[in-house]
Amino acid sequence: MAPPIITAMGLQAIAVALLALLGAAQSGPTPLQRFLARGDEPPVEYRALRRLEANNPKFNQSAWMTAWTEFDRVNGFRFTVAAEGGSGYIRSKVLHAALEGEQKIWANREPDRASFTDDNYTFDAGEQSADGLASVIVKPRRKDVLLGDGSIFVRASDGDLARIEGRLSKTPSFWTRRVDVVRRYQRIAGVRVPVSIESVAHILVAGRSTFKMTYEYETINGQHVGTPQPNASTVLLP
């Protein structure tokens, strides 16, 4: 018969091991594992009113635009300007160009280049953010204007994407030194959709320039979810 103290120590070790296994079982998947398990959701068909704003403090130039934007699998992405104002140069080169660039991306079937997959990124668990979201550090596998180097923030409970913060891994032009981007998401009618994009670009000669775009949804996947209206104070320009 084993000495009582050895038996007690053996039982204690078994108990500790069982508790550790129980704890591991109860802890379940990590936020990173939950996020990766979700995979990319299919493209969302929608109609939304967007407001775009851009500003360059160095030259004291700014502009804004509201536009109806739509996407469906048959007709792709399209937009109609509802109203706009401010610098004609910024409206043309930044605001209109942003929507035209998005239209081109969809027309060329390029969204897969930007998706959060192992083909595009490496993933590492990060720290919990101040707002309670779990962070995931993402590193692009190649330099691409559609890929960011930074962090994504997900709900710890289910891995659902809430925010992206990072720097474009490749700048869109020689004149642009770097672009920092924050993109926020919400679930509306059970569907994850972007609700805002903010960016700060550092440009040779022009210096620091800011861009912001917000979304108000009218329909998502055929379901009416809101009644957005262009600002009544805006004036439609030719």
Give the location of each predicted region.
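Bacterial N-terminal signal peptides that target proteins for export
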Residues: A2-I14
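Bacterial Sec-dependent signal peptides at the C-terminal "C-region" and cleavage site
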Residues: Q12, V16-P29
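Structured extracytoplasmic
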Residues: A25-D149, A156-A162, S169-V179, V191, ...
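Cys-His-centered catalytic/binding microenvironment captured across papain-like cysteine peptidases
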Residues: I188
